[in-house]
């Protein structure tokens, strides 16, 4: 798909495999029951879009960004979220995650202060050098998910399981854990 501008549109039950979205700008769009496998965002922007019951696997990006996107009941595999911050990194690529399943995701140097991951499944993923102050991971399945040099002060990990924390490199003051 090349050089498209779409605003306020709804896309349903679409499947893209190996597609490159070049110069595309999606604003306030809804993607429902869509699948994106091995796709690439190249010089593209997603702004305030919603993804409902979608699957996104092996997303690659070049000079692209996402701003304030919402994901609900989605499966998100092998995504490097920092690559979606674009230059400047002033806007968060993710506004919310609700009832999502993430595997092999990487969050690097992101500000996720007070972010609500609660109830999500985040497996075999990595948070590196992130600000997770007051983030909520309550009841998350975090199987083999690692936290490296993160600021996790006041984060909530009650009833979360499977995570690995770099206790010497992470700030953990007042974080809440279940024993």
Question: Can you name each region flagged by the protein language model?
Answer:
Residues 1-179:
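Tandem repeat scaffolds
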């Amino acid at each position: 798909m090349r050089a498209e501008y779409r605003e306020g549109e709804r896309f349903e039950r679409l499947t893209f495999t190996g597609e490159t979205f070049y110069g595309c700008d999606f604003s306030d769009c809804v993607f429902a029951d869509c699948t994106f496998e091995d796709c690439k965002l190249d010089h593209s922007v997603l702004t305030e879009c919603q993804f409902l019951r979608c699957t996104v696997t092996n997303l690659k990006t070049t000079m692209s960004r996402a701003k304030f996107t919402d994901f609900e009941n989605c499966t998100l595999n092998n995504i490097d979220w920092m690559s979606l911050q674009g230059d400047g990194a002033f806007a968060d690529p993710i506004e919310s995650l609700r009832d999502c399943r993430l595997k092999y995701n990487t969050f690097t140097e992101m500000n996720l202060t007070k972010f609500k991951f609660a109830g999500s499944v985040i497996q075999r993923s990595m948070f590196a050098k992130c600000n997770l102050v007051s983030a909520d991971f309550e009841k998350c399945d975090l199987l083999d998910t690692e936290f490296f040099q993160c600021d996790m002060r006041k984060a909530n990990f009650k009833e979360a399981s499977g995570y690995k924390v770099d206790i010497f490199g992470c700030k953990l003051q007042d974080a809440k854990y279940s024993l």
